[in-house]
Amino acid sequence: MEICPFVRLLDWRTLRAADCLTARQSREVDRFAIEELGISSLVLMENAARSVCDWFSQHVQASSSEETSFVVRVVCGRGNNGGDGFAIARLLWTMGYAVEIFATHPEAELAPDARVNAALARKLGIPWREMREFGEAAASARAEDWIVDAILGTGQSRPLSGVLAELVQGMNASLSRRLAVDLPTGFSADAGPGLGNPLTEQPHELVELCVRADVTVTFVTPKMGMLHPGAREYLGETFVASIGLPEKLLREAVSLQ
């Protein structure tokens, strides 16, 4: 079932390694688009955000009644995945959704494109809450609410620990539905979902170090980690979204490596 020309449901039955990109290849696609084709990184970010919002507009109707309203809590990291999140928050807000932003880092510490989209979201007056409030907000959320995970995407390079590990566990414990932008936090583009033990006082207890998404909207192509046997448990219903690159040029970018 296709939602629109730019967002399609992933068919797990036909997924092959040849269909997937590694984290390195994903970075090369972005580099090729920006440096070789001259497409602005902000344009790519906007296209990615619009694809996620296309999914929302098809599946999650904005409520016009306070009695039936729900909240979309967008959790944004410091890098480009966070930039996608700020843009998603802005677009959903203009579409009539009730949105709250939680940022893992101060604006001064954000990557340049993320900072641009954070500033735009600020100017629109979208509610911006302190990160320390997220645990309480997630714990008191209703099943109708949504958490948009825009923390790391394909940018994860090592297992989660500390504050990020606690944040992931808080997301998974929430009644909210969860949508992952590109990949759930803790899900490696190359290796799949993460397990580990950041809790030193319980050295023999394995805990989940990966967001359990109900929906994942991944960009350009599936990722190699999606071939992991346990991947679907963390990705949920998975969609592949275009960011505006023709397939022929995409193949050319990957073949250059």
From Swiss-Prot:
- Domain (YjeF N-terminal) ranges: 26-251
SUPFAM superfamilies the record matches: YjeF N-terminal domain-like (SSF64153)
Q: Which domain of life is it from?
A: Bacteria
Enzyme nomenclature, EC number? 5.1.99.6
State the needed cofactors, names only.
K(+)
Give a Pfam family name: YjeF_N
Annotated GO MF terms: metal ion binding; NAD(P)HX epimerase activity; nucleotide binding
Tell me the residue numbers annotated for binding K(+).
81, 149, 185
| Cofactor note as given | Binds 1 potassium ion per subunit.
Question: What keywords appear on the UniProt entry?
Answer: Isomerase, Metal-binding, NAD, NADP, Nucleotide-binding, Potassium
Please write the reaction equations for the catalytic activity of this protein. Answer: (6R)-NADHX = (6S)-NADHX; (6R)-NADPHX = (6S)-NADPHX
Q: Which residues bind (6S)-NADPHX?
A: 80-84, 153-159, 182
Its annotated function is as follows: Catalyzes the epimerization of the S- and R-forms of NAD(P)HX, a damaged form of NAD(P)H that is a result of enzymatic or heat-dependent hydration. This is a prerequisite for the S-specific NAD(P)H-hydrate dehydratase to allow the repair of both epimers of NAD(P)HX.
**Stored NCBIfam families:** yjeF_nterm
Q: Which family does it belong to?
A: Belongs to the NnrE/AIBP family.
Q: Which HAMAP family match?
A: NADHX_epimerase
UniProt protein name: NAD(P)H-hydrate epimerase
